[in-house]
Regions:
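Bacterial Sec-dependent N-terminal signal peptides
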Residues: 1-22
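Short, solvent-exposed loop/hinge segments that bridge or flank secondary-structure elements
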Residues: 22-26, 42-76
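Short helix-loop boundary/capping segments
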Residues: 126-184, 204
Length: 229
């Protein structure tokens, strides 16, 4: 009888404590993105599906920057990180506000980009977002950029989070492209030994009358290498 009681006690504790310990590991992974980083942004179109014979690919793009990611909010279910960018010549650098990422645990309320500057509200069920974290990204002007939800995975020495979500054209494309109106962003945030990486597998889409047509694929690989503050 004592063995049965002990077994039930251990099972109960594992059921209750595991989600909390997993959640805490998730939170530490998110907060590990804070700090000062040398950043390298790389983007390139990988595949073209356009039927237009005059189609011109976007040129590959590589940028470097120094960025500070500062924790500005943390509570039981929310973490907010503001990114500050240093740009300009080394002799005369200047600081600008950059993007912000807000993480929420088991968030059910989403504003998802449709196309042509139109957003749609979507409520997801508790079962859909169980154990997940949503990442909402804001632009320099605090306007919404995109929002997606996924599960943090900690396995084989890796910690990563993945989500696919619709978004407007990125800033690097907005001024040079008008032949598509939606980006489907495949985001992977992975914690690395040097810092972290934001890996993207994006689709460039024409959305018309709720029908999507993919004209190109794009790969993004952004590395954040930690340096002294």
């Amino acid at each position: 009888m004592k063995n049965i009681i002990l077994f039930l006690f251990l099972v109960f504790n594992s059921i209750v404590l595991y989600p909390q310990s997993k959640k805490n590991i998730d939170k530490e992974s998110i907060k590990s993105m804070c700090g000062c980083y040398e950043v390298k942004f790389e983007f390139a179109e990988t595949f073209t599906y356009s039927e237009d014979s005059t189609y011109v690919k976007s040129p590959p793009k590589t940028l470097y920057a120094l960025e500070l990611a500062h924790l500005i909010k943390e509570d039981k279910n929310d973490i907010s990180i503001q990114h500050i960018l240093q740009i300009g010549d080394y002799g005369e650098p200047y600081i600008i506000k950059h993007w912000r990422q807000d993480w929420s645990y088991q968030n059910q309320d989403f504003y998802l980009y449709d196309s042509n500057n139109f957003w749609k509200y979507k409520n997801r069920s508790k079962s859909e977002v169980k154990g997940q974290w949503s990442q909402k990204v804001y632009q320099v002007d605090d306007g919404p950029r995109y929002e997606g939800s996924g599960t943090w995975v900690h396995v084989d020495g890796k910690s990563y989070w993945e989500s696919t979500t619709p978004a407007p054209l990125p800033r690097r494309e907005k001024d040079i492209r008008s032949d598509y109106n939606l980006t489907l962003r495949g985001n992977r945030v992975e914690i690395m030994d040097y810092g972290w990486a934001h890996i993207q597998d994006n689709s460039k889409i024409i959305r018309k009358n709720n029908i999507n047509k993919t004209i190109a694929k794009e790969k993004g690989y952004n590395t954040y290498k930690k340096v002294e503050d």
